[in-house]
């Protein structure tokens, strides 16, 4: 039976889902990630010469009154298969096109040089799509805004406070003991749940539990007990609240939140109650940390951020809440897909195992510094994020008129950066349907850095990127060293868009002890 957490949608995922049409699935056959650096590049063929045209001249699918292109999306497989439809549309309409769903209109980008052009024109405070239901709740309860809602100088100030801890490799490396503590328990959990064939029922749910426990230990130094046989009420209520908040949030992005609030609809009531539960739990955890380390704040992750940067408590509560929500499912989703890819590519898994064994003596717990000597492990994660990304697109809202390609786009234009389209294109990756980590290690195979952006790009890049990578790299060390991840069938698995990109069925993998 599926647990509540397996059904919850990640923050990042929902964000993406709102900003664009939903996408179609594709069949899945078969990191030290660094942000793109300024470089000398040839003139982009999409921007070279010629007069600019206005946005109305953009190609795109037929837009009908009221519905926009929704009927075509549904005809091509529904909202869960939207990502595949976007691949098709880019082939048909080119690297930049417009699409409208209902009243929501966006411009889609599917070329590295267009993303680079956008990156180079980015303002000091890049904007993303407004999340009205969240803002409505915060205003209603007089709570603060976090990094996913804040804009302008306030966003920069709060992001800078967290960036000092979360974006510096040396600071993140200090968290490996906590991550390993949860991973040790997770290995025991897998042993406990495996049947005689090595199958774990509802694996995605278990991976979410691992991710939740890991981020909570990092943020609060607290374990919620989700990897134990009987989780406590607090953990269950918290997870149920996340599930409810996400489901109601999605509905209020389709119909005006102002209407729900004024009529006090059940959706608004449930949304508000869910946020109340989430904030109550987060506040209790943070207040406990602040009190415990009041005399020595530098010894604690959150206390140091709070005291060093003079954030208000409301700002700290909101930012941590959003960071936690954004981290849980996307990290679990990434681990799920790389386990699947390794199961379908045993030769890659064997090569990865040899690298891990060459660096780590038997039974030695992996440390952050050990990962420096594991380039193939990092390449495996990078390749998995390219082939089977957690989310198929990110977004931007132009805060000034901008020329992209040959089109002049007005201020306020919502841009869909179709990163999954980039990763699946033969123009960017030879044999793009193949899981081949070696491509990231071969100098002769030059890859445009703007063709692979799993954590976004620019100043609003995912602030938890380094932490997520550390969690995933260490998890691979633990899992691959202990288990042979085997495919239990060779039938293709579809990717469906459900906030994150999820498998169409229970993944056919088994954990066989080495």
UniProtKB/Swiss-Prot annotation:
InterPro entries xrefs: CYP11_CYP27_families (IPR050479), Cyt_P450 (IPR001128), Cyt_P450_CS (IPR017972), Cyt_P450_E_grp-I (IPR002401), Cyt_P450_sf (IPR036396)
Subcellular location: Mitochondrion
Molecular function via GO: 1-alpha,25-dihydroxyvitamin D3 23-hydroxylase activity; 1-alpha,25-dihydroxyvitamin D3 24-hydroxylase activity; 25-hydroxycholecalciferol-23-hydroxylase activity; 25-hydroxycholecalciferol-24-hydroxylase activity; heme binding; iron ion binding; vitamin D3 25-hydroxylase activity
Chief place where the protein resides: mitochondrion
PROSITE patterns for the chain: CYTOCHROME_P450 (PS00086)
Pathology linked to this chain's protein: Hypercalcemia, infantile, 1: A disorder characterized by abnormally high level of calcium in the blood, failure to thrive, vomiting, dehydration, and nephrocalcinosis.
Name listed for the protein in its UniProt record: 1,25-dihydroxyvitamin D(3) 24-hydroxylase, mitochondrial
Organism this protein belongs to: Homo sapiens (Human)
